[in-house]
Amino acid sequence: MSKLFWAMLSFITRLPVPRRWSQGLDFEHYSRGIITFPLIGLLLGAISGLVFMVLQAWCGAPLAALFSVLVLALMTGEFHLDGLADTCDGVFSARSRDRMLEIMRDSRLGTHGGLALIFVVLAKILVLSELALRGEPILASLAAACAVSRGTAALLMYRHRYAREEGLGNVFIGKIDGRQTCVTLGLAAIFAAVLLLGMHGVAAMVVTMVAIFILGQLLKRTLDGQTGDTLGAAIELGELVFLLALL
């Protein structure tokens, strides 16, 4: 299990992981690593939350929120934000399915993708600032948001098909079973409940699950499946929805 965790940490983040810690794990077995997604999210959110706490006393909540969101993006190599932008460029192009997938593969940033990036990043900064002003625990909120968003991404993998013939998303999409999905969601729920005492965290997770499930169904209808880009979009939107639900 530890080898699987380190492999997933190296796969979906840019955090330095010694190669020997995940050596010997076949790429085809990576789908089993979905259950580690909430734990990886917890780690990323905790680091981002620590950045907020350190900077808040020095430069105030808005700038602390700005840098915590920046650090979170850098730790993932902007991988999920890129998926969000590509998904919006493709889906909102109002073209045929095949053309949408072509647009999503294009490395150039379009108007829809640019607007989505600005909106999501700015919204995260504003929501974190507002939560801080209301006295909410930012470290716990960010840790829970990142854990839940990565856990609920399993909803776009279970019983979904991969929309392309090849790509990194094919490692997970359609490859995880019901037990893995339940364990992943269960871990995310436990983290949310423990970090945000009472039902506040669990309620926010329920809202996030509903939003991501609906997103998955809409993308399935539009693209006839999911891609690595749509998973990234789900994670980014999941973080935002969870934080909004805490307000």
Swiss-Prot record:
Its EC number is 2.7.8.26. The gene is cobS. It catalyses: alpha-ribazole + adenosylcob(III)inamide-GDP = adenosylcob(III)alamin + GMP + H(+); alpha-ribazole 5'-phosphate + adenosylcob(III)inamide-GDP = adenosylcob(III)alamin 5'-phosphate + GMP + H(+). Belongs to the CobS family. GO terms for cellular component: plasma membrane. Keywords: Cell inner membrane, Cell membrane, Cobalamin biosynthesis, Magnesium, Membrane, Transferase, Transmembrane, Transmembrane helix. The keyword RNA-binding does not apply. InterPro entries: CobS (IPR003805). The keyword Cell membrane applies. Pathway: Cofactor biosynthesis; adenosylcobalamin biosynthesis; adenosylcobalamin from cob(II)yrinate a,c-diamide: step 7/7. GO terms for molecular function: adenosylcobinamide-GDP ribazoletransferase activity; cobalamin 5'-phosphate synthase activity. This is Adenosylcobinamide-GDP ribazoletransferase. GO terms for biological process: cobalamin biosynthetic process. Signal peptide: none annotated. Joins adenosylcobinamide-GDP and alpha-ribazole to generate adenosylcobalamin (Ado-cobalamin). Also synthesizes adenosylcobalamin 5'-phosphate from adenosylcobinamide-GDP and alpha-ribazole 5'-phosphate. It holds the Pfam family CobS. It is an enzyme of class 2 (transferase). It comes from Shigella flexneri serotype 5b (strain 8401). It is found in: Cell inner membrane. Its cofactor is Mg(2+). It is a multi-pass membrane protein.
